[in-house]
């Protein structure tokens, strides 16, 4: 899998034979079960992604990742709240040290 940032991509306007921009697909297959209509994942920062952002990302085809800057129970509650709001796929940041195993299991 290739990872890129904004510095790695340059879009140069050119002539195109497409009939309509609506005929293009921006969808992206994350794995066998998850396809994003819009290949954008929100940052798992406490000031960025909680339930409302996860819902907005899903509404527009992206993916929200709930931040880990709270207790394990609070994070699990936020994920459940997003699911109850209708978000079928929501992520949860777990980190790589500390309570990451407990978060992954919650």
What are these regions (language model features)?
Residues 1-40:
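An N-cap/entry alpha-helix motif that binds or orients negatively charged groups
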Residues 3, 9, 48-106:
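Alpha/beta enzyme core
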Residues 39-41, 90-91:
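Short, contiguous strand/loop micro-motifs
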């Amino acid at each position: 899998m290739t990872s890129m940032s904004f510095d790695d991509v340059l879009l140069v306007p050119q002539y195109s034979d497409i009939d309509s921009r609506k005929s293009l697909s921006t969808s992206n297959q994350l794995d066998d079960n998850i396809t994003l209509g819009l290949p954008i994942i929100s940052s798992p920062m406490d000031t960025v992604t909680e339930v409302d952002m996860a819902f907005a990302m899903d509404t527009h085809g992206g993916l929200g990742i709930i931040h880990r800057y709270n207790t394990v129970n609070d994070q699990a509650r936020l994920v459940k709240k997003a699911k109850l709001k209708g978000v079928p796929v929501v992520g949860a940041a777990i980190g790589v040290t500390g309570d990451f195993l407990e978060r992954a299991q919650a």
